[in-house]
Amino acid sequence: MKNNSIRTVVATGIGAALFIIIGMFVNIPIFGNTSIQLQYAVQALFSVIFGPITGFFMGFIGHALKDGIQYGNISWAWVLASGITGLVIGLFGKKYDVTMGKFSVMSMIWFNLAQALGLLIAYGVVTPIGDKIQFAQAWSYLYAQSFVAGVANFITIAIGGTLLLAIYASSRTQSGSLTKD
């Protein structure tokens, strides 16, 4: 258990650092303060490999620090949404366990269903309500911004996350694949 907690803490720290760096230097603005954020594909990979706790804190800590450094203020609803996205993807990780060297079409479907659920909770509920409380913006703007971000993140994770997981799975040795000559 102790090794597992150390592994989780280290993975969270590395993941949060990657979240910050990728988020600050690799983003494509699309709407308002919303942009395509490629760090969510990496967060999906970490969430599956290291579990939901790492996924949550990688997104939560990484997003909070990124916003603080980049903008000088933090939108806590969006920070929480990043954490929830990683948490939900990680919670369903057993459905698409890539550590055994397999990432089948069915695993890809489960992965994308899980990320869709996480994004629906994060951007359909958390960000609009949280921003209404924190910034008192108009509901129409909040839902439009959340919808665009949710769709952009879905596409990013569906393409980038699926590719990263497929590459990772192909680098693992499958059970029973080694034979003695």
Swiss-Prot record:
InterPro entries documented for this protein: ECF_substrate-spec-like (IPR009825), UPF0397 (IPR022914)
| Full protein name | UPF0397 protein str0306
CC annotations in GO: plasma membrane
Transmembrane stretches, start-end: 11-31, 45-65, 72-92, 109-129, 147-167
- Cell location: Cell membrane
Which family, according to the similarity comment?
Belongs to the UPF0397 family.
The way it spans or sits in the membrane comes to: Multi-pass membrane protein
Question: Which keywords accompany this UniProt record?
Answer: Cell membrane, Membrane, Transmembrane, Transmembrane helix
* Family annotation (PANTHER family): UPF0397 PROTEIN BC_2624-RELATED, UPF0397 PROTEIN SPR0429
Classify the main location: membrane
What's a Pfam family this protein contains? Answer: ECF-ribofla_trS
